[in-house]
Amino acid sequence: MKKKLLSLLLALCFVMALVPMTAFAEGTSVDNWDGTADTSWYTDHKTDTEYHFTTAEQLAGLAQLVNDKTASVSFEGKTIYLDNDLDLSGTQWTPIGNGGNFGRYFAGTFNGQHHKIMNLNHHYTGDELVRNGLFGVVSDGGTLKNLLVIDADIDSNDGSLIAGILADWVNGGTVENCYTSGKIENNVGSKFVGGLIGQCTWSTQVKGCGSDATVISTESDEDHVDTVGGLIGQWENGQLVDYRLLVWRFCFLQ
């Protein structure tokens, strides 16, 4: 009984904790995406260690830089700040970091400063292995924090294996004070699907996060099994990882 009361109390605390985070973003300006990508904030300032985003085009530019097949930029040691809300309506989003290996991943720090990224739309039917959420691959100490991804609509009907609204795959990274809502749906088997993150591996830490996203898996083939979670689809490498390195605390789902 005591454990049950404690769990309910913790859930209430963290739900309430998100109220000021959401309220903080209310009333701020919103930039609407025109479908293009702007990389000038980086190409003209490559030695900078901090960048401030005010447009959705800059965010799309980040995806373009990280996903470049010949000259991918991981942003390790650099911090990106989101200075206002972004609306991604009307154009399909290309995740930041993609591919089936660690060749193209985000390793910097993305600080949303409690702002919202709204109406992320991604209906993918290609053959990339990781390509669904706001971030495709976060690795090597990459950090996502203080960010809300609101009213996302993700429909994964391919063989991409991993799908999450905030991030598909986090390998040895940190996700802190992040929240997602909307819908993520998978209609193909053998996937890891989560309302927040599709898959966490190695020394990943998830702290103070929540989601009330709808997570749907409709695969009916008994030979294909999905691993589905309200927050995280799968946490892998149980036999290889020292679980003292794994942190998952102060999280909730609705």
Where do the language-model regions lie?
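Positively charged n-region of N-terminal signal peptides that target proteins for export
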Residues: 1-5, 9-10
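Surface-exposed repetitive/solenoidal architectures
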Residues: 24-254
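C-terminal segment of classical bacterial N-terminal signal peptides
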Residues: 15-24
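Broad structural signal for hydrophobic residues in well-ordered alpha-helices, predominantly aliphatic
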Residues: 14-15, 234
